[in-house]
Amino acid sequence: IVFRAAQERSDIEIVAINDLLDAEYMAYMLKYDSTHGRFNGTVEVKDGHLIVNGKKIRVTAERDPANLKWNEAGVEVVAEATGLFLTDETARKHITAGAKKVVMTGPSKDSTPMFVRGANFDTYAGQDIVSNASCTTNCLAPLAKVVNDNFGIVEALMTTVHATTATQKTVDGPSHKDWRGGRGASQNIIPSSTGAAKAVGKVLPELNGKLTGMAFRVPTPNVSVVDLTVRLAKPATYEEIKKAMKAASEGAMKGVLGYTEDDVVSTDFNGETCTSVFDAKAGIALNDNFVKLV
């Protein structure tokens, strides 16, 4: 997904990939995707390396990032997407190998700073190793920031209705740490924990301790939804909240926070480039201080 997204931009060039898959299988997985469809471009393999849209991409299969020799490939930024090197100490091996910066594609497991577009991205001060947090945090944080900046959040609960992930079981299987998580993904709605809401307190310190949440894993292949139930400090009608969201989506958060009043469903957001889209028709208000936002 990172590769496909990069191909849509003119300011990013993929020059090297490290994966334990062989290049032929890597090419196959890039060409064909059950959720996002066929790759819009040419993909070949030559001498163990990928040739994508006519450009050679170095392929390696190193288990230890310190041995990757990124500098030889001209690598500037590494997207650390294995899920295995989520501390400064382990991710720094990429720097040792010649990369200039590392972006973890999931939440860090130590004090490595997290930055989220639409939340605290303006506080980035050139750190060489950062985390982009989780997909749920990226969806929730812009929404929570707009609400808090305009109306104040006294307290809030989040539920994410989350699409199936690769770590779930196709049928019931052993899962010693999370018994429910071991149940068949295609057969069940599975309650689960998530640290995404608490992580918002790290990227938006003013909300630390005011927000927590949970997840339901559901049998859909892609697109998840955040349901944010908020007690507001400053009374506001639902129309006023919609107006604030629309203004943010067209202003400071354009390209990060989207806004729609269409009668959409989850598949309408396959390939969505905004990290969060406010569904104006889906939310409700009990009164001017208690609202549910989607």
UniProtKB/Swiss-Prot annotation:
Cellular compartments annotated: Cytoplasm
Protein name: Glyceraldehyde-3-phosphate dehydrogenase
Positions contributing to D-glyceraldehyde 3-phosphate binding: S134, C135, T136, T165, T194, G195, R217
Site residues, Activates thiol group during catalysis: H162
Gene name of the record: gap
Catalysed reactions, semicolon-separated: D-glyceraldehyde 3-phosphate + phosphate + NAD(+) = (2R)-3-phospho-glyceroyl phosphate + NADH + H(+)
Top-rank lineage group of the source organism: Bacteria
An individual GO BP term: glucose metabolic process
